């Protein structure tokens, strides 16, 4: 069992609480507002809320076309608008899923560096529990670019990319999957669940009204999709609902590399990227979904368009964290914005 001192997490949280910041209540309808930036630039990250704080881990950036893979963890305290750095990951990762399991923080899978390349999909799973980050049961198969949520006290991972053949190290070695797994903390094992209706990667997810929602994403061959799928754990059933609309500004489909959180009884999706001959671009759009009406409404655009960003909601406020500011790699940032939908 690998153990990393988690007291840094606890100390960081305590230190943040003593900083001389005054939390200001944000009102709905004012649009996205700037918050304290993540101290380092990074993209291809995920996050989860643990004890009222937002935790990110890993990621990548590509200055001068050189891929740099992160092993840092960041802890954001919304009450003080301050960041602290947590303990380093056991190994560098980009696209690792950050999720809670019954409230306990987990960091799972993602891509690491190996002799085969910088896109080696991993099976590792680490859990922060007590004063250590410990190795728990690995994934049944390598997985990256997935959706991770805490549903019914279990960590669920849905869709993503993994190698279907022996090769595992390059981006092209990975394929889109509809896999759906759930981690049982008491049994320390992953259970195979009903797969998603569509294989895709780089989607976004959230829990709302006791269900797991997966929105957007893309396929290698088909590009972005606005598809919205809902998993009902009680009936073990997937339903497909109204998709995210195409971007009015570009005509392109909002899909891959977006982020989403649930707040105020609604889903809030934003960001992402699209590819096109000669380039592509990054979305600033925000879309708000009302589950009662099965309808998406355009929300205020982010101040900084981004993809590969992280999303979380705390006390009704949605946070958009870091991400790539140009299509693909090349300009990662640490910008943080907040919205009350």
Question: Model regions: which residues?
Answer:
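N-terminal export signals
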Residues: 2, 8-25
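Kelch-like beta-propeller repeat domains
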Residues: 5, 13, 26-341
């Amino acid at each position: 069992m690998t153990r990393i001192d988690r007291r840094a997490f606890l100390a960081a949280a305590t230190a943040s609480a003593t900083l001389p910041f005054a939390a200001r209540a944000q009102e709905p309808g004012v649009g996205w507002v700037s918050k304290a930036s993540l101290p380092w630039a990074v993209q291809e990250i995920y996050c989860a809320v643990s004890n009222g704080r937002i935790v990110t881990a890993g990621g990548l950036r590509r200055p001068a076309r050189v891929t740099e893979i992160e092993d840092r963890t960041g802890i954001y305290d919304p009450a003080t608008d301050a960041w602290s750095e947590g303990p380093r990951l056991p190994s560098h990762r980009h696209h690792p899923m950050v999720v809670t399991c019954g409230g306990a923080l987990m960091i799972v899978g993602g891509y690491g560096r190996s002799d085969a390349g910088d896109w080696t999909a991993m099976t590792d799973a680490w859990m922060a529990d007590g004063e250590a980050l410990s190795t728990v049961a690995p994934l049944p198969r390598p997985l990256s670019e997935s959706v991770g949520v805490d549903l019914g006290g279990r960590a669920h991972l849905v869709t993503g990319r993994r190698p279907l053949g022996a090769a595992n190290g390059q981006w092209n070695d990975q394929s889109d999957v509809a896999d759906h797994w759930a981690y049982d903390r008491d049994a320390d094992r992953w259970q195979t669940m009903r797969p998603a209706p569509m294989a895709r990667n780089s989607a976004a997810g959230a829990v709302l009204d006791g269900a797991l929602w997966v929105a957007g994403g893309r396929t290698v061959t088909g590009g972005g999709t606005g598809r919205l799928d809902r998993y009902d754990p009680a009936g073990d059933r997937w339903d497909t609902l109204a998709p995210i609309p195409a971007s009015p500004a570009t005509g392109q489909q909002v899909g891959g590399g977006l982020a989403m959180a649930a707040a105020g009884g609604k889903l809030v999706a934003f960001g992402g990227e699209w590819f096109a001959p000669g380039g592509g671009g990054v979305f600033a759009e925000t879309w708000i979904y009302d589950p009662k009406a099965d309808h998406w409404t355009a929300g205020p655009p982010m101040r900084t368009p981004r993809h590969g960003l992280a999303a979380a909601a705390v006390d009704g406020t949605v946070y958009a964290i870091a991400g790539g500011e140009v299509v693909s790699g090349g300009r990662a940032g640490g910008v943080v914005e907040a919205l009350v939908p």
